[in-house]
Amino acid sequence: MKTVVFAYHDMGCLGIEALLAAGYEISAIFTHTDNPGEKAFYGSVARLAAERGIPVYAPDDVNHPLWVERIAQLSPDVIFSFYYRHLICDEILQLAPAGAFNLHGSLLTKYRGRAPLNWVLVNGETETGVTLHRMVTRADAGAIVAQLRVAIAPDDIAITLHHKLCHAARQLLEQTLPAIKHGNILEIAQRENEATCFGRRTPDDSFLEWHKPASVLHNMVRAVADPWPGAFSYVGNQKFTVWSSRVHPHASKAQPGSVISVAPLLIACGDGALEIVTGQASDGITMQGSQLAQTLGLVQGSRLNSQPACAARRRTRVLILGVNGFIGNHLTERLLREDHYEVYGLDIGSDAISRFLNHPHFHFVEGDISIHSEWIEYHVKKCDVVLPLVAIATPIEYTRNPLRVFELDFEENLRIIRYCVKYRKRIIFPSTSEVYGMCSDKYFDEDHSNLIVGPVNKPRWIYSVSKQLLDRVIWAYGEKEGLQFTLFRPFNWMGPRLDNLNAARIGSSRAITQLILNLVEGSPIKLIDGGKQKRCFTDIRDGIEALYRIIENAGNRCDGEIINIGNPENEASIEELGEMLLASFEKHPLRHHFPPFAGFRVVESSSYYGKGYQDVEHRKPSIRNAHRCLDWEPKIDMQETIDETLDFFLRTVDLTDKPS
């Protein structure tokens, strides 16, 4: 049975050995080049492949069409992935008639995502395991083929648990690979309501927060002990690593982080105390706790910190132009929920952000970006991150006011982009799913899909082309002048405060707001060209969480990236959206205040949008970049979004003159 293997780490090596022992013919192996900043304590898949005479590759992007074509030429019967670190696209997964299977280091459906070995220790679990499951587009979500449980002992650390999991994986593969080969497997669907998902960990995540219980800190030490980078803390500005520890049920009134004793080295925690058994100063060698205390100059009563004493306390300053808009006001709410952001905003109105106007870390000026150029330039210079969210983004305006769309969406934003270049500020720019135009790909991919628009005499494309050209300008500034940027492409975000019903009355709103207005007023729901066009609708909360992670930019992973933010699972036609909305409306507690439903009416796009309109039949995002850069995937079902959006708008209606 011919197979193509994607593999890395010890699990990759043992997976390859298991396949060969089971009689599989491995046509090619795909792996990664080693990261020079990572301690390589594990086996080399590349070396093993070379020793076994198997072709081995380490492409930067295995999902590139050229690699998809080369893998297709290998005609694999089955595909296996053993700890390969990138998501594999659906085009590759579909190449194998017998399917694709992944080995995951947890008991799915728990601990989907990255670093499950470390996360189970961080969270103090007493059991984990290994799972072989069928691969689907979503990470770790396919049906389970086989599992083995592994007990976690109280004295297990990351490396000992790693060895246990490797042993279990060998057993599991030895038992299961022959069954896959003969097509004799029983698959069990995962229960989505029980799933948990965890993101990538970085060395910076392992700081010891002394206000937490000693047991929690001890678990952190176990989770990242050598050969992982280790848990750490600071004495003043000097960093040190804790390699091993013990929990003491020490009753102390000392402040968390205070040194209770130096022999043994005992630190007060939020609950109990942590003994540092072995550790290492940043410029030293590993030593036992009391010697480390002497090296660091610790005495009873000394204080340890989670960050350097001189660490900057200043909040990150975020400039949001168009702060009163749909994305702007929800993003402001998310940023102000944290304690390390200062938000500066400009917009022509403030109705959606009135709830923030008295917040001490929110600063708002009412104004127009085409007039307040000096204010904008000053605040670009002053702030750390710039989000120019001002745009005309309603389809009817593309044909009704194409020049205004160009002037605002392109010309005004180009000026802001140039300010960011001038003052070397990071820009997070809202591209759009519209840039893909009439692309025929099943999934619209940021790095590979063609951007296809209609002829010049179809002005509906002026928005798409304006945004696309700005994307290209930003990319060029990044390449040639070092502009720090991220482009994000929202796919049909929905939720409360999307447009308003007054905008819908003049046709200048998005689809769901227009449909809600029809229900409120008792007018027919208009289905443009039958409403068969499909879109992938995304809850604003999912979208904002992804955007927040772009702003956070952990490990600078978002720099220079284009990221689709959408929900491929929430695909529906406009007609289906209308039917779901109607069902929600009919059972809403305020339903009796509104007129009877007036039915659906099919209208031609030219009569609704005017001359020069073209529509797009489907628009489904690939979200592999969002997985890779943000450890993000959408979670909220479309029906929940519809219910909450409808409820919000119905409660904004003045019911005094409505029938009861």
Swiss-Prot record:
Pathway recorded for this protein: Nucleotide-sugar biosynthesis; UDP-4-deoxy-4-formamido-beta-L-arabinose biosynthesis; UDP-4-deoxy-4-formamido-beta-L-arabinose from UDP-alpha-D-glucuronate: step 1/3; Nucleotide-sugar biosynthesis; UDP-4-deoxy-4-formamido-beta-L-arabinose biosynthesis; UDP-4-deoxy-4-formamido-beta-L-arabinose from UDP-alpha-D-glucuronate: step 3/3; Bacterial outer membrane biogenesis; lipopolysaccharide biosynthesis
Subunit structure, as described in the record: Homohexamer, formed by a dimer of trimers.
Keyword Phosphoprotein part of the UniProt annotation: no
Family, similarity comment: In the N-terminal section; belongs to the Fmt family. UDP-L-Ara4N formyltransferase subfamily. In the C-terminal section; belongs to the NAD(P)-dependent epimerase/dehydratase family. UDP-glucuronic acid decarboxylase subfamily.
Organism of this sequence: Shigella dysenteriae serotype 1 (strain Sd197)
Record site: Raises pKa of active site His: D140
UniProt protein name: Bifunctional polymyxin resistance protein ArnA
Residues annotated for UDP-alpha-D-glucuronate binding in this entry: 393, 398, 432-433, 460, 492, 526-535, 613
Family matches, as InterPro entries: Arna-like_SDR_e, Bifun_polymyxin_resist_ArnA, Epimerase_deHydtase, Formyl_trans_C, Formyl_transf_N, Formyl_transf_N_sf, Formyl_transferase-like_C_sf, Lipid_A_modif_metabolic_enz
Active site: H104 (proton donor), E434 (proton acceptor), R619 (proton donor)
GO biological process terms on file: lipid A biosynthetic process; lipopolysaccharide biosynthetic process; response to antibiotic
Pfam families xref list: Epimerase (PF01370), Formyl_trans_C (PF02911), Formyl_trans_N (PF00551)
Coiled-coil intervals, chain numbering: none
Binding site for NAD(+): D347, D368, I369
Keyword entries, A-Z: Antibiotic resistance, Lipid A biosynthesis, Lipid biosynthesis, Lipid metabolism, Lipopolysaccharide biosynthesis, Multifunctional enzyme, NAD, Oxidoreductase, Transferase
Example of a GO MF term: UDP-glucuronate dehydrogenase activity
Cellular component per GO, a single term: membrane
Region Dehydrogenase ArnADH, residue ranges: 314-660
Binding site for (6R)-10-formyltetrahydrofolate: H86, L87, I88, R114, V136, T137, R138, A139, D140
Domain of life, source organism: Bacteria
